[in-house]
Amino acid sequence: MCRPSGYAVYLWHCDAQGRYSLYSSGVTGENYLRGVSATDSSGNVTFTTIFPGCYSGRWPHMHFEVYRSLSAATSVSNKIATSQLGFAKAVCDTVYAQSAYSGSATNLAQISYASDGIFQGNAGQVATTSGSVSAGYTASITVGVSV
């Protein structure tokens, strides 16, 4: 949640195979699973996307940056905060049982939230998640940003 309203949040994450558009081999010319949205009058921001895959060495996560406005979000030098949100293992296990996420279950088995070099077990970065594979999931997290 960002107050006042109108702050921009840039969110990006990897695909079901653990690849990042623009950066990973085979998808450097593609731009997907990235988006910017402005906070509403309650300071909330919403994105519709897929559950991120799990790649070797990292716990499943989404990256985000916060900017003072949508126009400020055009340059990384304007960001006022950068962080990530992670997901509970039970949700990851359920999603990664689906065929589209075939490699993610193997990668997840090789890491823990506590051993991830970024999260290091920080429970404050785990999103609250509800839903199901068939209906879709909703993840939410409250983030404090000093401005």
Model-derived features: positions:
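Beta-strand-dominated extracellular/periplasmic modules and repeats
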Residues: 1-110, 114, 146-147
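Glycine-aromatic-enriched beta-strand/loop faces of beta-sandwich-type recognition domains
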Residues: 111-124
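C-terminal, well-folded lobe of enzymatic/effector domains
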Residues: 124-147
